[in-house]
UniProtKB/Swiss-Prot annotation:
Signal peptide: none annotated. The gene is FOXS1. It comes from the Eukaryota. This is Forkhead box protein S1. Keywords: DNA-binding, Nucleus, Repressor, Transcription, Transcription regulation. The keyword Nucleus applies. Residues 184-196 have a biased composition (Basic and acidic residues). Residues 111-157, 179-200 are annotated as: Disordered.
């Protein structure tokens, strides 16, 4: 008769195997075996560990999986605990519509994932009903739209940089101060004429330079572009309220960049009688640097005394040259 070997410390020990049930099946078994078809979370843990030794000796990581399935699956319903009963934690029970989710009562096979139809309609229905009136009120044609009646608060189109020239400065003046504008059609050059009687300038009228003519007074060629000629500082336009005499306004015509020969300009500059009390001319009327000498006829008529704003006379340079139709200072 052979003796069987005694089990020693080196003999292999049998480890419990994992049961072939899903976590949903384990929770359903624990709930159905509990009194009242409801169990707390700790009661579900005790049932699983008491029936399956694998979960009793295994690490407690499976408990997190139990809580995860209780929260995500709609077949488990959380019922609050009654305040009159001792204990803590809510109860978990099965939804009445999911008792047949296992085929033939076997927890090994589950029919399909349970979806609570009534709860889904109850939760989604009010949301759609709330969205409906909001969409209807926003698209109601009877309600005036606040954005359509709002006027544009931005200023109109700004003038181009060309408007900063002398011509644009005159155009920016009010209608009461703006002189009569000329059309943009080119005009033939005016021939110099000798007229004995000057044409008096009204206080509200100011000379306007034509942009189409060249600038022979400064020796510019006829092809000199308008943009290059207007890059200089523009001559300030004086308002009629400034009290400037008519003779001084006519003298300002000689300082414009592009001008035709005024018939009465020569006679006005030849007169030695100054204006009674004109204001101080602006600083931009100072004499520029002398230009290269040309075949010109010097005309010395003495300085033009202009009464300054502080009461002292202000004289212009006496070096005034004359060409066959132009006058300018050097």
């Amino acid at each position: 008769m052979q003796q069987q070997p005694l089990p020693g410390p080196g003999a292999p020990t049998t480890e419990p195997t994992k049961p072939p049930y899903s976590y949903i099946a384990l929770i359903a078994m624990a709930i159905q075996s509990s009194p009242g078809q409801r169990a707390t979370l700790s009661g579900i843990y005790r049932y699983i560990m008491g029936r399956f030794a694998f979960y009793r000796h295994n690490r407690p990581g499976w408990q997190n999986s139990i809580r995860h399935n209780l929260s995500l699956n709609e077949c488990f319903v959380k019922v609050p605990r009654d305040d009159r009963k001792p204990g803590k934690g809510s109860y978990w029970t099965l939804d009445p519509d999911c008792h047949d989710m296992f085929e033939h009562g076997s927890f090994l096979r589950r029919r399909r994932r349970f979806t609570r139809q009534t709860g889904a309609e109850g939760t989604r229905g009010p949301a759609k009903a709330r969205r409906g009136p909001l969409r209807a009120t926003s698209q109601d044609p009877g309600v005036p739209n606040a954005t359509t009646g709002r006027q544009c608060s931005f200023p109109p189109e700004l003038p181009d940089p060309k408007g900063l020239s002398f011509g644009g400065l005159v155009g920016a003046m009010p209608a009461s101060m703006c002189p009569a504008t000329t059309d943009g059609r080119p005009r033939p050059p005016m021939e110099p004429k000798e007229i004995s009687t000057p044409k008096p300038a009204c206080p509200g009228e100011l000379p306007v330079a034509t942009s189409s003519s060249s600038c022979p007074a400064f020796g510019f060629p006829a092809g000199f572009s308008e943009a290059e000629s207007f890059n200089k500082a523009p001559t300030p336009v004086l308002s009629p309220e400034s009290g400037i005499g008519s003779s001084y306004q006519c003298r300002l015509q000689a300082l414009n960049f592009c001008m035709g020969a005024d018939p009465g300009l020569e006679h006005l500059l030849a007169s030695a009688a100054p204006s009674p009390a004109p204001p101080t001319p602006p600083g931009s009327l100072r004499a520029p640097l002398p230009l290269p000498t040309d075949h010109k006829e010097p005309w010395v008529a003495g300085g033009f005394p202009v009464q300054g704003g502080s009461g002292y006379p202000l004289g212009l340079t006496p070096c005034l040259y004359r060409t066959p139709g132009m006058f300018f200072f050097e």
